Regions:
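Charged, amphipathic alpha-helical linker segments immediately N-terminal to NTP-binding catalytic cores
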Residues: 1-41
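Conserved nucleotide-sensing/catalytic segment adjacent to the nucleotide-binding pocket
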Residues: 23-37, 89-147
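Pre-Walker A adenine-sensing motif
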Residues: 44-54
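Pre-Walker A (Motif I) flank of P-loop NTPase domains
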Residues: 56-63, 117-118, 225-226
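Glycine-rich phosphate-binding P-loop
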Residues: 63-81
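Switch/connector loops and helix/strand junctions flanking conserved nucleotide-binding motifs
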Residues: 73, 100-103, 129-135, 161, ...
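A glycine- and Lys/Arg-enriched "phosphate-lid" helix/loop adjacent to the NTP-binding pocket
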Residues: 133-151, 159-211, 258-265, 272
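NTP-dependent small-molecule kinase module
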Residues: 211-214, 218-274
Length: 274
């Protein structure tokens, strides 16, 4: 899964088919079944990681989700991590920065939401907004944005050195698929609340966003924190693929149940005597 989706030298976002399902044979029904099958293992690995931290473990996982609007970032959190114990999940959605946040460097608002040891953190949007929308809409000067690519790479290298495994995912949808999803939000009263008129404004800059993503992905995909581009026209596939990336990362970490720091047999005897 990693190698199929990883951003590597020569990567071209324009060449990625957003309706493809690399690494999976089957359709929506089979994808849902595979997702359900992986949920149990993911939940157990997450709980082991959390338990490990209660006994001095320092490791954590950070899942960074970036995408155009309607690509399904929220659905990833619900469907991929929905079976995991919520006490070990830290999810945060970054909105437009506040006046206070704008008064500091762009990573200032990110650091408080980094996952603590034992947690899986999820960023719905992230520090990458400062080289994506800022580039497209001219919110920062070109030389400032250029400097940020290096700052981001250093920041992520620092996190990895401190014990955080970073999984950066771009959910890649087509302009036509986004249009269909926006139309669905308008057609269905139960989805009207999800619609934001500003999403149509951003569609006018589609090509510029694709260019900004191409630059950001290639400039900041490093051995420490590689990017993965997940075709997301099919929501079921995107969820399956992200679950696979998380499972691969957690299997590599291989967290273990902590050994009891007390005499188990003696405690059984004490309990039996009560």
């Amino acid at each position: 899964m990693h190698e199929l989706l990883r951003v590597s030298p020569g990567f071209s976002l324009a060449s990625i088919d957003s309706s493809a399902t690399p690494g999976f044979v089957g359709g929506k029904k089979e994808g849902a079944a595979s997702l359900a099958a992986g949920a149990t293992e993911l939940a157990e690995l997450q709980e082991k990681l959390f338990a490990e931290s209660r006994f001095g473990g320092t490791r954590s996982v950070l899942l960074v989700l970036q995408a155009m609007d309607t690509a399904g970032k929220g659905g990833i959190v619900d469907h991929v991590l929905g079976e995991a114990n919520p006490q070990g999940i830290q999810a945060f959605s970054f909105k437009a920065p506040t006046e206070e946040e704008r008064a500091h460097d762009f990573l200032w608002r990110i650091r408080p939401h980094l996952p603590q040891p034992g947690y899986i953190g999820v960023f719905d949007r992230s520090h990458y907004e400062d080289v994506l929308i800022h580039r497209v809409r001219g919110f920062s000067a070109p030389e400032v944005i250029e400097e940020r690519y290096g700052i981001i790479a250093d920041f992520e290298r620092e996190l990895v050195a401190a014990g955080t495994t970073i999984i950066k995912v771009m959910l890649h949808i087509s302009a036509d698929e986004q249009k269909a999803r926006l139309r669905e939000r308008l057609d269905r009263p139960d989805k009207n609340w999800k619609y934001n008129p500003g999403d149509v404004d951003e569609r006018q800059h589609w090509d510029a966003y694709q260019e900004a993503y191409q630059i950001a992905l290639t400039r900041t995909s490093t051995p420490d924190a590689p990017w993965y581009v997940v075709p997301a026209d099919h929501k079921w596939y995107a969820r399956w693929a992200v679950q696979g990336l998380l499972l691969d990362a957690l299997r590599t970490l291989d967290p273990q149940w902590p050994a009891a720091d007390y005499d188990v047999d003696a405690e059984k005897e004490r309990l039996a005597a009560t």
